[in-house]
Amino acid sequence: MSLRVDYQGGQLEFVADADRLIAAWAGPADADASDQADRIRSALEAPLDFPPLRQVVVPGDRVVIPFDPSLPAASVILGKIATILGEVGVESMIAMIDGRETASRDLAIPTGMTLEIHDPSDRTTLAYLATTEAGRRIYLNRLVADADCVIPVGRLGYDERIGARGPWSVIEPGLGDATYPAVSLLAPLRAKVEGSEEPTEVSRLLGSQFQIAGVPGRSGLLELIAGEASSVQIRGAAALDAAWLFNLDDRADLVIAGIGGPDRLATPADLVAGFRTALRAVNRGGKIALLTDLDLVAIREALRGPTLPGGDLEKALAWADVYLLSKAAADDVEDLGLLAIDRPSQAAKLAASAHSLVTISQADRTRTALLS
C-alpha cells in the first residue's frame, strides 16, 4: 500500500506491505481557508460563556494581547482583534510575544497595534503580580501586569511540562521569568491535557477572563475558540484530542516520524516533541527514523539543551536506534549518538526490512496513546 509522511521541507512517499503496517497517522484534515476570516470573526463575536470581545473593553483601556506567533493565521487573527477593539474606541493595543519564540518572523502587526518582545532575562521589565497557592512569587512583564485588559491568544497543543499549551501558557510561562523542570523523553503519558494548574492560576490572578485558542489543522487553522477562560480550556482540550490524538493498538519495530509541516518551520522544541511521540510508538530494541529539515545548531539545542534532563538522550537511544534526516553533516549527527540518513528514501529502505511499521506525519503536534 502507498504511504506518505509529511515533514518540514518535504514528504516521504513509499510502498509497504499492508500486513506489516500497524497504523499510518496523517493528522487532521486541512483547514478550509475559504471562510477563515468569517470563522475568526464569529468566534470573537459569539464566544463561549462570555460577552463578545467588543463588550470586554471600554474606550481608553490599555489592552495587551499576549500572542503565540506559531498559531496558524496569526496575522489574520490579530487583524480581526485590532478591528473590533478599534471600533470600540481602544487606542492602546500592544501585541506581546515571548522573545524565545522562533516562529515570529512572518508575523504582520495591524495598523493601530504595536509589537513588544518579552525578554525574561531583563529583570527591569518584570513586575510582581501575586503569590500562588503553592507559594511561588509570580513576576510577569510589566506591561501585562499593568494593563487594563489582557486578552491572550495561543495555539493549542500538547506540552509535557504543563499538560497543554494554549492562551494560558502564553502568559505563564511565556511572559514571565519561570522555567519548568525538564521532562524525560521516556516519561509516561500525562493523563491530564486541559492545562497546568499553575498557568491557569496565574491567568486567574491576572484577571484574564477572555481567552482565545486556536486548533491547528494539518495545514492552516482548523478552529478558533474564544470565550471564558475555563470554558475555552475544556472545549479546547476536546478539540485538540479530536484533531491530534493518535490512538495506537500496538508498538512497532520501526516508526517513521515527520517533524514540522509543509507550511511551518520546525523548532528544537518540535524535534523533542516528535522524538517523544515516536518513542511511545516503538518497541524496545526497535528503530526510529526522524525526518527533519533542521540544522546542527537546532539539533544540538534540542537534544543537548536544557529541555531534557542530563543523560536523557542516552536512555532514549538505549530503547531504540534513531536515524535522523537533517541538514547536519553525518559525522556531527553520529557524534550525538544518532545514525544519519541523507535522503528520505533511506527511511523507506528501513521499512522494507521491518517486521512492523508505524508512520506519523507532524509527530511534534501529535499525541500517541497506546490502547493495548
Predicted region positions:
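C-terminal non-catalytic interaction/assembly regions of soluble proteins
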Residues: 3, 271-372
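Long, well-ordered mid-to-C-terminal structural blocks that present hydrophobic/aromatic surfaces
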Residues: 233-301
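N-terminal amphipathic/basic leader segments beginning at the initiator methionine
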Residues: 1-43
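Histidine-anchored nucleotide/phosphate-binding helix
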Residues: 71-92, 274-282, 288
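Glycine-rich phosphate/diphosphate-binding loops that line cofactor/substrate pockets in enzymes
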Residues: 48-66, 85-90, 246-254, 281-283, ...
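An acidic, phosphate/nucleotide-engaging active-site surface
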Residues: 105-165
